[in-house]
Amino acid sequence: MKAAIYYGRGDIRVEDVPRPNAVGLDDVLIAVSKAAICGSDSSEWDHGPVLAVAPVILGHEFVGVVEEVGSNVTTFAVGDRVVSGAGISCGTCEWCREGRTNLCAKYFTLGLQVNGGLSDYVVSPASICRSIPDDVDDVSAALAQPFAVALHGLRRARVRDGAGVAIIGVGGIGGFLVAGAVARGASPVIAIDIDDERLSGAKKLGATHAINATTEDATAMVLDITGGLGVHSVVEATGVQGNPQKALDMVRRGGDVLILGLHTRANQLDLLQFTLREVDLHGTLAHVCAEDLPEALAILASSNVAALVLDKVIGLDELVEDGIKPLAERRARGKIVVDLHRPVRRDAESKRG
């Protein structure tokens, strides 16, 4: 089978590798049809290894058809269309027993620590797979996993019907945050970014307001929109130093601040504000399959979110040049999906990029 193998920084190759021949008792073998590229894939190529254990087949946002089932699996049958979650949990630790499988003490990720779905076939635990509704095509379904990450974050931030939310950073996962907030009935939904094209996309996804933070005072505008009160929830999705404090400045008393962006440098925060205004600060990690994947699929089935967040569909042989590099260089205008059914050109096989 063909697979995209990560060997280290700047080194991803499409190669022929053996098809998985050992399906665990609780696993399913999936014939992959579509796989979206995650920002973490481009980060590993650009400046990794960070989380990836090379060599490894990349890909943790994928869908396909069940080809084989383990003997303990009763939830799926051969021929079922499924989407897989990304994280594998033990099911027995304290966090798993609480339903917080994303915090599992033995958590690891498909496509980073074990072989993933940028390949013709992949083995995935049946417990993290969900059936795809008939009215959701494979390209759309390939977006369910990143959408689930956004929905999990919104749940952590207590984004809800009738409550206002500001989203700082609406590229990549930010578009899903906007779509999820709109689907949950939040109002107003305020998109904040430094890119007018991304802000235009956020408006198409249903944001009620769009603020370019390079030309406008975002905090002042949020306060003006909310009559000086601030929004109920703020999601910081950029990882840019200083933005957590801005999030705190625009949230209302008793509100919620969620840090979704990955901050690799220390930030200064006015902790007195948290105390005097009783603001809750939250982190968020990945998603919980049982809660977030079904909601993502339901929204994708009932909306045009997929069409609005999709940049393009490419072949596996185009992965590096037309997928990984545009993401690493911030040229991508949305999600990029790989079609595993497109023939791989002979001149692309074993190509190093």
Where are the regions a protein language model picked out?
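Rossmann-fold dehydrogenase core element
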Residues: 256, 269-309
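Glycine-rich beta-strand-centered segment in the early N-terminal region that forms part
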Residues: 20-35, 48-94, 133-135
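Mid-domain Rossmann-like dinucleotide-binding core that forms the NAD(H)/NADP(H) cofactor-binding site
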Residues: 136-215, 220
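C-terminal hydrophobic helical "lid"/dimerization subdomain
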Residues: 245-249, 290-353
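NAD(P)H dinucleotide-binding glycine-rich loop of Rossmann-like/cofactor-binding domains
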Residues: 88-168
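Glycine-rich cofactor phosphate-binding loops and adjacent beta1-alpha1 units
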Residues: 157, 200, 204-280, 322, ...
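Short, surface-exposed secondary-structure boundary micro-motifs
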Residues: 33-35, 71, 87, 101, ...
